[in-house]
Amino acid sequence: MVSLKTEIAGFSFDNCLMNAAGIYCMTKEELLAIENSEAGSFVTKTGTLEAREGNPQPRYADTDWGSINSMGLPNKGIDYYLDFVTELQDQDNSKNHVLSLVGLSPEETHIILKKVENSSYNGLIELNLSCPNVPGKPQIAYDFEMTDLILSEIFSYYQKPLGIKLPPYFDIVHFDQAATIFNKYPLAFINCVNSIGNGLVIDDETVVIKPKNGFGGIGGDFIKPTALANVHAFYKRLNPSIKIIGTGGVKNGRDAFEHILCGASMVQIGTALQKEGPEIFQRVSRELKEIMADKGYQSLEDFRGQLNYL
């Protein structure tokens, strides 16, 4: 019997597939639709200290090869999502969940995390160190000194399981430098990758999204090679206790298989979920199981990280 079960930081999931933060997770209704789908879990919209409207519309556009967006972290505020996942965790047959969050400053991040620390929520946290679409706010994880400082401060008081969502890295030296920092801390996971920041898509003679004069994060098919490279590079460098969530370019079972082959313990779906809805989890699960059965694999552990080299 082929199984898609997986585990992160002691939390078990019946299916390794879930949504990516930012997609189909703004409201309780959207999150419940994923909860009731074949997905193994959901991650909430990235919650900030206060609710945000985000960037002006239009701020998302589909393309033939994926998508471009400059959402600007629209969300209903951390209290909305924290209350919801806390309420859900006490229900019978509830799945384990991931609460995504970030402050618009290091001070705000600490305020939010201390709120979570003092709450009764006992699930996973995904700290977003990689949003490329908030004007005037750099992606923290590209500043290694700042990343080290923030993680040091967080783990001086935060005791619950926490992982981080990362931007894509493109230099081998950066993989080495980042992994050295991450291995210093009791991270539950890293998520590779957020969208590739500051792409530009043009229709005829005009940009397709309004914020930042058309500059936005690139997702979908286009970023899969970059996502796979990040997953595998960190799989080879991180302590085994730090699991990896693979995100980027997943629209079918083969894409999910490749992320796991590169070392991912869970796989998130973003652009394709936006286009297809929660029904995508049933299809991709079926396709992934068929691939595994054809290859004689019964579990994800049979092939996770077992990428062959020439």
Swiss-Prot record:
PROSITE patterns: DHODEHASE_2 (PS00912). One of its GO terms (molecular function) is dihydroorotate dehydrogenase (fumarate) activity. InterPro entries: Aldolase_TIM, DHO_dehydrogenase, DHOD_1A, Dihydroorotate_DH_1, Dihydroorotate_DH_1_2, Dihydroorotate_DH_cat, Dihydroorotate_DH_CS. Keywords: Cytoplasm, Flavoprotein, FMN, Oxidoreductase, Pyrimidine biosynthesis. One of its GO terms (cellular component) is cytoplasm. It catalyses: (S)-dihydroorotate + fumarate = orotate + succinate. The keyword Cytoplasm applies. Binds 1 FMN per subunit. The active site is at residue 131. Pathway: Pyrimidine metabolism; UMP biosynthesis via de novo pathway. Signal peptide: none annotated. One of its GO terms (biological process) is 'de novo' pyrimidine nucleobase biosynthetic process. FMN binds at residues 45-46, 128, 165, 193, 220, 248-249, 270-271. Its cofactor is FMN. It is an enzyme of class 1 (oxidoreductase). Its EC number is 1.3.98.1. Substrate binds at residues 45, 69-73, 128, 194-195. It is found in: Cytoplasm. Catalyzes the conversion of dihydroorotate to orotate with fumarate as the electron acceptor. Belongs to the dihydroorotate dehydrogenase family. Type 1 subfamily. Homodimer. This is Putative dihydroorotate dehydrogenase A (fumarate). The gene is pyrD.
